[in-house]
Amino acid sequence: MLPLRDSVPGRTTPYVTVGLIVANFLVWFWELSSPGVDVHVFRDGYYPCALHGPCHLPLGFHALPWYEGVFTGMFMHAGWEHILGNMLFLWIFGNNVEDTLGHVGFLFWYLAAGVVAMAAQTFVTLEFAGVHAASVPNIGASGAIAGVLGAYFVLFPGARVLTLIFFIIREIPAVWFLGIWFLLQAYTGGISLLHPQSGGGVAFFAHIGGFAFGVVTGLLLAARRREPRQLYLR
């Protein structure tokens, strides 16, 4: 399923969403420069093993400290399909969440979502996948963007998403689109635990952790918006 647009018009100019997209593309073009994407990924990606080693990296490479790698990795991508897909999702769903949180709030919230997503993937990798899997660089904005999807899921339950499904374009409820997306992540994540070779290099638990962060914080925001104003008598 590929989202084309949603039905919720933005109330403000999404400066931060646009800025994040631009930043991701700037980093991607930097990755494409000499000495190439693979070298940049191995040098500047986030490694779960950096939390408490050892890391088994190719000769000549050293893992960044985790508190640096978690942010550099959040803006790096492995290929055109990777970055274009992520930025499409951020463009469609990010502006409405930014409307809700405000520009500055959304920026810090987005970064926090990315950190929580990386933490979820790190926990699963260290607990279940072993040392060698922990020495594989984790990159991509998808964990933070999964947070955006989770928040959108609870903040805009009546929204609809124009969706390309194979060769058919249909408008479907956002809760269906995002719910199916999450269930696919959970299913494939579970399969990857049972059969690690089937993971295809995708950080499913970063997606799951990011989405959960978005749902929880979105529910808190929704509850605050529904709270009645306190009346005081003098």
Labelled PLM ranges:
Residues M1-R234:
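A detector for small-residue-rich transmembrane helices and their helix-helix packing motifs
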